[in-house]
Amino acid sequence: MSYTPGHHAGSRSSSGNRSGILKKTSWVDQSERSHQTYNRGRKPQPKFTVSTQPQGNPIPHYSWFSGITQFQKGRDFKFPDGQGVPIAYGIPPSEAKGYWYKHNRRSFKTADGQQKQLLPRWYFYYLGTGPYASSSYGDAHEGIFWVASHQADTSIPSDVSARDPTIQEAIPTRFSPGTILPQGYYVEGSGRSASNSRPGSRSQSRGPNNRSLSRSNSNFRHSDSIVKPDMADEIASLVLAKLGKDSKPQQVTKQNAKEIRHKILMKPRQKRTPNKFCNVQQCFGKRGPLQNFGNSEMLKLGTNDPQFPILAELAPTPGAFFFGSKLELFKRDSDADSPSKDTFELRYSGSIRFDSTLPGFETIMKVLKENLDAYVNSNQNTVSGSLSPKPQRKRGVKQSPESFDSLNLSADTQHISNDFTPEDHSLLATLDDPYVEDSVA
């Protein structure tokens, strides 16, 4: 008996195409079919925002899961050993084996007429299913990455049935806690639905309002806002063009960086967001017992540090801050610059609790250990490096060995001079007096 991922979804056999983007059906094809039904013989209007480029390699099989999309160029798609198999209700760990298939997507035309190639998207198929159903686990294929759990036997195909897209919806991709996702990729969600983009549904075709339906379809044909998959980049470019902004990253000059830093520092301390233009020390001061988080790299980049987003998942919400913390109000002494201004401090203390089931737990623990009290090790390295300063030498002047000895001697004397008693100082003063021979009477 074959296993069926999320077999409870099979009861929704009448859902049709409700899964939208999670099922790799073409919404453009759906809209074209609806035009053929309601256009009364008229020629379909061209879709001005659709590229004439090829649509990319087709997906001959339907994956059980939503895809993983690349959003940063030059990033490799990979998972650590034993990770990378999506979890699904009804599938035991012994069947958690398969491969990720790279789907090269189409290009589209931006608002300024340029062609932009979408980055690829990856789909998961169980071992023995999908476009490489006949391949054995580990076979070398371009655009294929094999994954399996430690409990799975990869020598035999998985006993998982194929997905019928007409009665079975795709499952949002989720991974077991601690899974490290490929950098530069994000998991596709199920927020967008195709139901809103189907003007020819049965609920609309029924009833006496066929004339209004015809008029709405006529307006629909002339609209270039047809919902199509993979339109996030296209929509963003249209919005930026409407706002008069260039979607290409602008080069930040020193003057711009200075303005950004000034704008951040003008905000109240609790509203500042440190970044690579205004670092942590500039926003909140040096590290110490009361501000003990951040290593040298994170202090320099602030929230632009690649490790910061996973830490932000631990940050409390405003509600948790006020209602889950101990708050105390104190009045501070007025500053000398503004003696007439009353200054108050709202001091807080609380805790953030999490366990090993939190997604990315191992990565979070690693980042926390690297940044908690990192200033202590930094200070120790600074002190150890300053105990034996390297003597400075002038350019073009060759120093003799005697000069190096005198420099080292003066450095040693400087470190031990604080231990001298007043008697020792008087004795040294006597020794420093020039030698004068005794006169002969």
Curated annotation (Swiss-Prot):
Binding residues for RNA: R105, R121, R163
InterPro entries: N_prot_C_CoV (IPR044344), N_prot_N_CoV (IPR044345), NCAP_bCoV (IPR043505), Nucleocap_CoV (IPR001218), Nucleocapsid_C (IPR037179), Nucleocapsid_N (IPR037195)
Residues found modified as Phosphothreonine: T173, T421
Chain spans, region RNA-binding: 53-193
All copies of domain CoV N NTD, residue ranges: 60-189
Keywords: ADP-ribosylation, Host Golgi apparatus, Phosphoprotein, Ribonucleoprotein, RNA-binding, Transcription, Transcription regulation, Viral nucleoprotein, Virion
Biased composition (Low complexity): 11-20, 189-220
GO CC annotations, alphabetized: host cell endoplasmic reticulum-Golgi intermediate compartment; host cell Golgi apparatus; ribonucleoprotein complex; viral nucleocapsid
Polar residues composition-biased segments: 380-389
Region (Disordered): 1-56, 186-226, 380-408
Keyword Iron part of the UniProt annotation: no
Annotated ranges, domain CoV N CTD: 257-379
Pfam name, any one: CoV_nucleocap
Region (Dimerization): 264-382
Family: Belongs to the betacoronavirus nucleocapsid protein family.
Entries under HAMAP family matching the protein: BETA_CORONA_NCAP
Protein name: Nucleoprotein
Organism: Human coronavirus HKU1 (isolate N5)
